[in-house]
Amino acid sequence: MRNSFIRNGFIAAGAVNILAVLVLSRAFTNRVIPETDPEVMSNFGLLMIAVWGLAFLAVANRYRSVKWLVGAFVVEKLIYATVWFRWLTTHDLAAVYAKDLFAGVFYSAYGLNDFSFFLFFAAVFYQLHQAEKVPNNHAINR
């Protein structure tokens, strides 16, 4: 993957985390999201999702020097995607939509988003790992 694509991927991951939380939670005033899954999506949990977004933005131009942080991003996204899948298979999404459209959209999309960025971060981590195997080689195209 080219450097510009990867940089833009980190920016997109950060922007989606921050903007989706702020918009769909209506700046943390939407009670349906935290009531629907208080263990994971409390207002504090939503705030932490935005903080992860800040971390993604912070490394967009420096990801090559923080391979293991990218690895942590892989784990974070895998956990959220797995939790979402478990939630989706044990809850009634239509009932969430009936209570609040924004909450329904949030619970419909967050796991797909996290799984997509899990794949992206995993590919970046793999590319960084491969680049370390070849001395004096920059496997990531500029």
Model-derived regions: residue spans:
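Cytosolic juxtamembrane helix and N-cap/initiation of the first transmembrane helix
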Residues: 1-17
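Core segments of alpha-helical transmembrane spans in multipass integral membrane proteins
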Residues: 15-19, 39-61, 75-82, 112
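Non-cytosolic membrane-interface motifs at loop->transmembrane helix junctions
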Residues: 32-42, 67-73, 96-110
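Membrane-water interface at the C-terminal end of transmembrane alpha helices
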Residues: 109-135
